[in-house]
């Protein structure tokens, strides 16, 4: 068997644990179900992940390698160096491979992470449908989007060059620059955007952030309001692709 084919076969037999909500997303979308041995507890929460039904089929962990050792993983995935040197050292002693994905800062970074995870689990072909959909969105994106503001609890918003704003541009929306990364009630009252994108992340909770979004000025701002599923915006990974496709279909 050629060396590359042997490597793919070994990867396809991997037992994979994810210690992070964002790597949970990549793993659930790109691995075979039987390869997954543990996911972070957050992915099992309906308020945190659109994939919670799938995630509940697997044991949860609290984000440490010690939590998953009893599952005998051969590969442990984290993001942004979560767990640090201690995780890498322990994994090395136990002959467990680790894959630490970088936090993507642009759409190319998301595509790269998709490819890396698919290759790591021995199924590079699983990346292709997601990459094809992403490229289709990029090819068909308009040059100048509609003036828009993305908003979540407490008036938090996105920087105009952030990864979140790049996803918005694929939906034909141009994030307005705002001082301090905040939307004020005064802005919504005096210079509202053409479209207000409201995150529904934990919107049903009795929290200060949720109450801010229910303020009369926010609710009655003279602008078209679109509700977005706030959960994919936490990680800004491949689950943003179906959400952007959905936002495109909404009437403006």
Predicted regions and their residues:
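Extracytoplasmic substrate-binding proteins
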Residues: 15, 75, 85-156, 177-179, ...
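A short, structured surface patch at a secondary-structure boundary
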Residues: 15-86, 176
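Short secondary-structure boundary segments
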Residues: 20, 40, 80-81, 180, ...
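Short, solvent-exposed loop/turn elements at domain surfaces
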Residues: 24-29, 44-49, 78, 151, ...
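Short, structured coil segments at secondary-structure junctions
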Residues: 32, 54, 93-96, 171, ...
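Alpha-helical, coiled-coil/dimerization segments enriched in small aliphatic residues
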Residues: 42-47, 54-55, 158-183
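Proline-aspartate-enriched helix->loop->beta-strand connector
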Residues: 57-60, 64-78, 96, 184-201
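A ligand-binding cleft/hinge motif common to bilobed small-molecule-binding domains
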Residues: 82-93, 198-213
């Amino acid at each position: 068997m050629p060396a590359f084919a042997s490597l793919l076969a070994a990867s396809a037999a991997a037992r994979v644990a994810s210690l992070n909500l964002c790597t949970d997303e990549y793993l659930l979308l790109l691995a075979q179900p039987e390869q997954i041995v543990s996911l972070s507890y957050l992915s099992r929460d309906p308020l945190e992940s659109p994939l919670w039904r799938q995630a509940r089929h697997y044991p949860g962990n609290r984000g440490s390698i010690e939590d998953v050792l009893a599952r005998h993983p051969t590969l442990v995935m984290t993001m942004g160096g979560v767990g640090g040197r201690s995780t890498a050292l322990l994994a090395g002693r136990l002959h467990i491979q680790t894959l630490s994905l970088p936090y993507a800062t642009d759409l190319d970074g998301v595509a790269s992470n998709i490819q890396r995870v698919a290759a790591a689990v021995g199924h590079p072909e699983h990346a292709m449908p997601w990459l094809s959909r992403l490229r289709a969105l990029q090819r068909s994106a308009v040059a100048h989007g509609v003036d828009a503001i993305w908003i979540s609890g407490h008036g938090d918003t996105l920087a105009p060059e952030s990864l979140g704003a790049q996803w918005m541009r694929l939906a034909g929306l141009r994030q307005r620059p705002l001082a301090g990364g905040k939307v004020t009630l005064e802005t919504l009252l005096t210079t509202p955007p053409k479209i207000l994108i409201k995150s529904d992340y934990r919107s049903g909770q009795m929290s200060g952030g949720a109450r801010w979004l229910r303020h009369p000025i926010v609710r009655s701002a003279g602008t078209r309001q679109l509700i977005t599923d706030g959960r994919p915006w936490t990680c800004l990974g491949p689950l943003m692709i179906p959400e952007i496709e959905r936002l495109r279909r909404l009437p403006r």
